[in-house]
Amino acid sequence: KCYKEASIDKVHLIRPYKNVLNELKYLKKNKIKFSIVTSKDFRRTKYLLNKFGIQPSSIHCPNKKLKGKPHPDHLLFSLKKNKIKKKDAYFVGDTKIDFLAAKSAKIKFIFAKYGYGKNKKIYKYQISNFKQIRQIIKM
């Protein structure tokens, strides 16, 4: 099986990182817009968002119209669609590719140390728990 098929078969095993669900619900409740920009396919992404009750302002997955990360296309499209200024935006990611996308889009990057990426670079904003997001965005 290819990766995409295998990952769809195992999607029910995926669990969110600690505090992510509560914090996303907190953002939504406080009218803070957030989007999902991922390298994962739309079908799997939508399934997981529905499963965990996450309702982002928009969802951006690989497609034929926009270049994927590290290109900034999806981030810039999300900002435009949601009427968010670059100066007000943050992109949370866990890989160097995520950082490069944010840098190319000229938006602030928050490195999630608990994720996949094991990058030794020291980023201006880093979190080891998603709950720390409030401190960075000054909520």
Model-derived features with residue positions:
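Short, basic/glycine-rich phosphate-binding loops at helix/coil junctions
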Residues: 1-7, 54-59
